[in-house]
């Protein structure tokens, strides 16, 4: 396709099917607004060109997939497939999109199938990622970590090695999800992409947010079942929501209060998932635990309402789902249902959430799931294990152990987090 007027020149290749584009590239730019509102014309406005390219690419990718029939079954080639597009952008929306960029969608049919299995409609997925710009939650040595504007999706920057590891485990992961009928604590992988801007490649994986898009998390733990070097640093502890670790959990005498049936269901899922990770020789994963305090949240909401009334203006962040602001997107499901009260959640959306038991000291909601599952027990880990054994002694509780030992120790630790 050649460039004419305000249209970008596009060349597209796909390992499965090649179809038309241009649903997102045919109109004028709208005036910039502060609030999260739907842009009738998709201009993919973001402060970072990379995020604009991600929004553009996801929009294009989903529009293409909608035109391709859903296969009766996935074939081995689908787990190696990709769809690529190269865009030369002269005039259209040039204040937001780079003049040249490339977008690659890995295994589109596989992730489409996973989204369907996890109860996420493709168009809701598209809206949640493209209606308004995602915002940066944190940035560290592991890359950026973003949330979709409606807080239902996590967008994580990963390495090319992570992409290779995902390709190795993807068919096993898919098989596991099918086998357990989507009843899992593993991350829900929903899409994986490569963005190329200014001759630099960035790799992105999209997952369901383990925390609620609606209920605030007041305490957060990353638990591995290891006690060596597993305490949050002083620098971490002064953050508004620090990521606390195993030693912090024990030192604070923290407990998770759920009834016996919920505990049994949770541990069944966890054991099944950990067995799967051990079989693939994966390790270094963590249990992410988020705690929502219901009474504290009610107090905070009252204070916010008082502030809002005093200022008589809307907050720049829309609490999607709480007040029914989005007719679409993943959180849009809530709008056809009655409003949720304090500490209530919709299990279809907050799939990792568990309510505290009636005999808990205070009313809480827990969000628990497995994260960082891509570390393979390779030569690097073996070397690290040898070094740590020399430093701490053979019997020390160190995190770098064989996958079998890691899984066993992890399950033992998590069993004991419950009251």
UniProtKB/Swiss-Prot annotation:
| Processing and modification events after translation | Phosphorylated, phosphorylation is induced by EGF.
Its name, as the record gives it, is Phosphatidylinositol 5-phosphate 4-kinase type-2 gamma
UniProt-listed Pfam families: PIP5K (PF01504)
Stretches assigned to coiled coil? none
Recall the GO molecular function terms of this protein's record: 1-phosphatidylinositol-4-phosphate 5-kinase activity; 1-phosphatidylinositol-5-phosphate 4-kinase activity; ATP binding
Which enzyme type, at the first EC level? transferase
Domain of life here? Eukaryota
SMART domains referenced in this protein's UniProt entry, alphabetically: PIPKc
Keyword line: ATP-binding, Cytoplasm, Endoplasmic reticulum, Kinase, Lipid metabolism, Nucleotide-binding, Transferase
């Amino acid at each position: 396709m050649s460039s004419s007027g305000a249209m970008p020149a596009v060349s597209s290749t796909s390992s499965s099917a090649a179809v038309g584009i241009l649903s997102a590239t045919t109109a004028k730019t709208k005036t910039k607004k502060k609030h999260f509102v739907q842009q009738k014309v998709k201009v993919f406005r973001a402060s970072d060109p990379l995020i604009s390219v991600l929004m553009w690419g996801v929009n294009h990718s989903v529009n293409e997939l909608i035109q391709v029939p859903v296969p009766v079954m996935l074939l081995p080639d689908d787990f190696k497939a990709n769809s690529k597009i190269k865009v030369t952008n002269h005039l259209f929306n040039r204040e937001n999109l780079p003049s040249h960029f490339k977008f690659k969608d890995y295994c589109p049919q596989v992730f489409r199938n996973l989204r369907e299995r996890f109860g996420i409609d493709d168009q809701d997925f598209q809206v949640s990622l493209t209606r308004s710009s995602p915002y940066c939650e944190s940035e560290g040595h592991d890359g950026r970590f973003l949330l979709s504007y409606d807080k239902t999706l996590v967008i994580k920057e990963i390495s090319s090695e992570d992409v290779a590891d995902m390709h190795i485990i993807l068919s096993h992961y898919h098989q596991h999800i099918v086998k357990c009928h989507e009843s899992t604590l593993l991350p829900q992988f929903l899409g994986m992409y490569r963005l190329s801007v200014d001759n630099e490649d960035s790799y992105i994986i999209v997952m369901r947010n383990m925390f609620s898009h609606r209920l605030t998390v007041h305490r957060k733990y990353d638990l591995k079942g290891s006690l060596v070097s597993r305490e949050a640093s002083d620098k971490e502890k002064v953050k508004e929501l620090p990521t606390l670790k195993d030693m912090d959990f024990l030192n604070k005498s923290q407990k998770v209060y759920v009834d016996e049936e919920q505990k049994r269901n949770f541990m069944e899922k966890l054991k099944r998932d950990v067995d799967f990770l051990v079989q693939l020789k994966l390790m270094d994963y963590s249990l992410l635990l988020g705690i929502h305090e219901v009474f504290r949240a009610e107090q905070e909401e009252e204070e916010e309402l008082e502030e809002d009334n005093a200022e008589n203006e809307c907050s720049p962040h829309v609490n999607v789902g709480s007040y029914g602001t989005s007719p679409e997107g993943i959180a849009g499901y809530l709008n056809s249902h009655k409003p949720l009260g304090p500490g209530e959640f919709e299990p279809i959306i907050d799939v990792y959430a568990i309510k505290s038991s009636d005999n808990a000291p205070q009313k809480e909601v827990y969000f628990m799931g497995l994260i960082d599952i891509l570390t393979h027990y390779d030569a690097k880990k073996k070397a690290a294990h040898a070094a740590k054994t020399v430093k701490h002694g053979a019997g020390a509780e160190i995190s770098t152990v064989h996958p079998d030992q890691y899984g066993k120790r992890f399950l033992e630790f998590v069993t004991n987090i419950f009251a």
